[in-house]
UniProtKB/Swiss-Prot annotation:
Gene field: murC
Binding-site residues, ATP: G120, T121, H122, G123, K124, T125, S126
Enzyme Commission number, as recorded: 6.3.2.8
Name of this chain's protein: UDP-N-acetylmuramate--L-alanine ligase
Cellular location(s): Cytoplasm
A GO biological-process term: regulation of cell shape
Gene Ontology CC entries for this record: cytoplasm
Organism: Rhodococcus jostii (strain RHA1)
SUPFAM superfamilies per the UniProt record, alphabetical: MurCD N-terminal domain (SSF51984), MurD-like peptide ligases, catalytic domain (SSF53623), MurD-like peptide ligases, peptide-binding domain (SSF53244)
Pfam family, one: Mur_ligase_M
Length: 503
């Protein structure tokens, strides 16, 4: 007996090891479904799914559709990662098996729940994860589907016993318009995924259309510090959708400093200050209707994370959670896999890894890194006060997608200028074919700080180790295989313990 509609009782997933697909598979298995799938390579995610009962084949061929007795009732795929000539999709068409996209499955799994969906150009995964952790701390057991692994839970999805479903709503292909949300969080809105949408206007419109899908009595939570999401909030408030409320958060004030509203949008939470402390910080803010500010110690760095915390707070409160307990949960939030994740420390050099692959994300992460380098590791304080004061930020940046690199090369260069030293790798093409004249060198040309273009990924760890000194912070950055370099950089630092370049 399953807790699933008939069409989802036997599901085959093409690309099952991906972050989004593996999460859906976990929920299907937990609800009694039979799941098979294929992926290009073995991974930790694939092994975890096998342990839960999924039948997974490495490589793609038509025979994968026979992994489940009786074959699948439906085949699930994604727009971006799986080509239409994939042999499993071709075989599904030949057999007359329906092929649907991942968001359609997620929308079906959400039915019967109160849905809290987090959208925006950046910050979706971190905000969604923070919201989940806060609700769990408050005694809720929400179902959730997130684009990255929560450090606390070690998973990206869960079938909960409660009536709340929290999910990251991906706008990259417009698929978020399949959802029917009760609460929508919008962290920011600015041009991205233009290879799919074709224009900035079309990209922005998808957020308006998403907000219009809010249920009567629903809530839109939008960041007022971001021009794009603030404008969205103003449009939705002016439109007067039936029963839909709009709450803003951020540090922005109207002309007379009033708390009640900014440009017609009610302010639910105002950020008063964020002070970096060690690898986190202290957030001071005020909630609407309260006379006194509140303070919470956060375990993740960066002002952007402080804003994400306010978004999670307002959404969790709307779900019925207690504010004090929400803040305790936020204080205990340890981050998400590949979101300013600590890799290790060697000879006074701290190495972090981050998924940032858009200029705005790069700026936010490097801003947090600059705060961090001014808050040195306790061991560095003991070893040398001089080295602590002279620490610098070194970023190893791998551009993601040729189309995005061509569009944003100059903006990437300006964003990377927030680091003290920059190593630019070649483009990680993922699903795209190379474009003439587009490479990492295009980004490096726009960097005004000391920059090194390194097209050979294998040479980067030794190069970075030669640049680094005690007190420095190194960040490997990008959505591709740059993530593998963190431990290799630590190995290179161990191999050259006495080499510290002059500043």
């Amino acid at each position: 007996m399953t807790d699933l509609p008939a069409e989802l009782e036997r599901v085959h997933m093409v690309g099952i090891g991906g972050a989004g697909m593996s999460g859906i598979a976990r929920i299907l298995l937990a609800r009694g479904g039979q799941v098979s799938g294929s992926d290009a390579k073995e991974s930790r995610g694939v092994l975890a799914l096998r342990a839960r009962g999924a039948q997974v084949r490495i490589g793609h061929d038509a025979g994968a559709l026979d992994l489940l007795p009786g074959g699948p009732t439906v085949v699930v795929t994604t727009h971006a990662a799986i080509p239409k000539d994939n042999p499993e999709l071709v075989e599904a068409a030949r057999r007359g098996i329906p092929v649907i996209l991942r968001p359609a499955v997620l929308a079906s799994l959400m039915q019967g729940h109160r849905t809290l969906l987090v959208s925006g150009t950046h910050g979706k995964t971190s905000t969604t994860s923070m919201l989940v952790v806060a609700l769990q701390h408050c005694g809720f057991d929400p179902s959730f589907a997130v684009g990255g692994e929560l450090n606390e839970a070690g998973t990206n999805a869960h079938h909960g016993s409660g009536d709340v479903f929290v999910a990251e709503a991906d706008e990259s292909d417009g698929s978020l318009l399949q959802y029917e949300p009760d609460v929508v969080v919008v962290t920011n809105v600015e041009a991205d995924h233009l290879d799919y949408f074709g224009s900035t206007e079309a990209y922005i419109q998808v957020f308006d259309d998403f907000a219009a899908r809010l249920s009567p009595g629903g809530l839109l939570v939008a960041c007022l510090d971001d021009p794009g999401s603030a404008a969205l909030a103003q449009r939705v408030a002016a439109r007067g959708l039936p029963g839909v409320r709009v709450l803003g958060y951020g540090s922005a004030e109207d002309a007379d400093g009033a708390f009640a509203s900014v440009d017609g949008v009610e302010v639910g939470a105002r950020l008063l200050s964020f002070e970096a402390r060690d690898v986190g910080g202290v957030l001071q803010f005020q909630l609407a209707g309260e006379q006194s500010p509140r303070t919470v110690r956060m375990g993740v760095p960066g002002r952007h994370m402080a804003l994400n915390a306010l978004a999670a707070l307002l959404a969790a409160r709307e779900a019925g959670a207690d504010v004090d307990e929400i803040l305790e949960g936020i204080a205990g939030f340890g981050g998400v896999h590949r979101r300013f994740q600590f890799t290790g420390r060697e000879h006074g050099v701290r190495v972090f890894d981050d998924y940032a692959h858009h200029p705005t994300e790069v700026r936010a992460v490097l801003g947090a890194a600059a705060d961090l380098v001014r808050q040195p590791h306790e061991a560095d304080r003991r070893e040398s006060e001089d080295s602590v004061r002279s620490g610098k930020v070194i970023v190893v940046f791998q551009p993601h997608l040729y189309s995005r690199t061509a569009t944003f090369a100059e903006e990437f260069g300006h964003a990377l200028d927030l680091a003290d030293e920059v190593v630019v790798l070649d483009v990680y093409g993922a699903r795209e074919e190379p474009l003439p004249g587009v490479s990492g060198a295009l980004v490096a040309l726009s960097v005004s700080k000391p920059v090194h273009y390194q097209p050979d990924l294998s040479q980067a760890p030794r190069q970075v180790a030669a640049l680094a000194s005690p007190g420095d912070v190194v960040i490997t950055m990008g959505a591709g295989d740059v993530t593998m370099l963190g431990n290799q950089i630590l190995d290179a630092l161990r191999a050259a313990p006495h080499h510290h370049p002059s500043r």
